Amino acid sequence: MILLKRGLSVAAIALAATVALAQPGRTETCNRQTFESTNYIICDAKTDGTGLHLFWKNSDDEPYRNFSKIADAAASRGETLVFALNAGMYQPDFSPMGLYVENGRELRPASKTTPVRGSGPVPNFYKKPNGIFYLGDKGAEILPTDRFLKQKIKPQLATQSGPMLVIRNRINPIFIVGSTDKTRRSGIGICSGGAIRFAVSEDAVNFHDFAKLFRDHLQCPNALFLDGGGGAGIYVPALGRNDVSWHGGYGPIFGFVE
């Protein structure tokens, strides 16, 4: 219970609350949550995608590679990078592995590659189905890659990754319940009411349990895996996080800017 000092007006309380909500890096944008004994950081973007951006290269045509450089670039424009995370898997030169659209410009085409059978474990990006998160005229959506391509969508921003975690409220059937293949993982979901929600595990988790987080806890009928292990980094200064990639940097990066 909070006791108010005599003389503090209701108007002053309302003003203080408004100012608190307007603070950059506010903690209600990202928070720590626990689901089935696994700890996560959950971040919410605005339903219409306002403030959500994709970053890859700076004005010198060089990959940003880390969150601090994006935060510095935002600050130079008088803006604040509230949170950021890896936006999907990438090549050794930090280029996106699949479709990448930034500010309406397609900088990388969609990947339709299927690995040759018997050539070893299938990389996560190519596990079926992989998918595309995009922001278009009708808002944000996540679709399996083949469905996205058939619809010939022209998005404002888009990134391709894989595999899909949840498809039309069903967990991807390739995932194994109780799998011992556990690592830190990151993903994005389109959730109840059209909310855009990001999740990064702070503990090791398998694919099935990570997908279950999106479907059952975050209420996301469609969700996409972004990256795992050293690639599952996040920037949330309000929570004391500014991760560094184990791979020398990140490729495409989601950033929420105010």
Model-derived regions, located:
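Zymogen propeptides
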Residues: 21-124
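Short, solvent-exposed aromatic-acidic interface loops
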Residues: 57-62, 146-151, 201-204
